[in-house]
Amino acid sequence: MRVPAVAAVVLASGGGARLASALASVAWAGERIVLDPAARLTREPLPRGVRLHAGAAEPLELTTAPWVLLLGDGEIASADVPAAIATAVAEPGARPAYRIPVAVQGFGATLRPPRAPIRLARRSEARLRIGPGLAVDLGPPAGHAGQLRSALIVRTTERLGEAVEHLDAQATTLAALLAERRRRPRLWHLVLGPLAAGGHTLVARPVRQRGSARWFLAVLAGYRAAVAYAKLWERRRAESAERW
């Protein structure tokens, strides 16, 4: 089915199969946009009709569609997401924004954080928010956010080297977003940021779990936050050196 009222914005960290899967999962959207804050994908081949925005921007600036759906490039929309969204946005009393669960799959486990992020919002509300642990969503909404049952899915590679490489790319994207917001890295960011990111994974509800997978996924989440702040720190140092 098609949902022309929705523009799907993919917050990209890298290209290749992960980005292609994210875009394919929202082929039903009226518009598909790749947001590339770190400007790394200027030569990435994209499907016909997909627009690329290199550099930081708010989703509301990228489209005239009434609604915006936000995905990461490692996420895919499950098969029942379009119907759930179509029903929600067509309601006369539609909320200004909706929370959508995110299920993390990897290393034999499937985890779902207890609080779903806001990933669907009216265009006027569609601003990126970077929360504790550097989780990115849309918000805060002007009113109470609704809740969809259908989920977005994150499929973590089972190969440690590939997982670390992808997390490093995500950290580069997050550092670009933080720099655009003039965030100044502090020592406590390097300490508390990874703890918050890992903590979100540790308290996630296990849909399916094997052995120590939860701890391993928590370590990876903490690693991403630590590297993002380290990259922001280095970026600030380079900017200061250029001024002198």
What is each stretch, according to the model?
Residues 5-7, 31:
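Cell-envelope/extracellular polymer assembly enzymes that use nucleotide-activated donors
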Residues 9-28:
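Short, well-formed alpha-helical segments that are part of the catalytic scaffolds
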Residues 21-25, 58, 84:
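A short acidic, amphipathic alpha-helical/loop segment
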Residues 30-32, 46-54, 143-148:
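Active-site regions of enzymes building and remodeling cell-envelope glycoconjugates
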Residues 36-37:
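Acidic ATP/Mg2+-coordinating residue in the GHKL
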Residues 40-66:
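Active-site-proximal specificity loops/subdomain of glycosyltransferases
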Residues 60, 66-68, 78-239:
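Catalytic-site signature of metal-activated, phosphate-bearing donor transferases
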Residues 69-73:
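Catalytic metal- and UDP-sugar-binding loop of GT-A-like glycosyltransferases, i.e.
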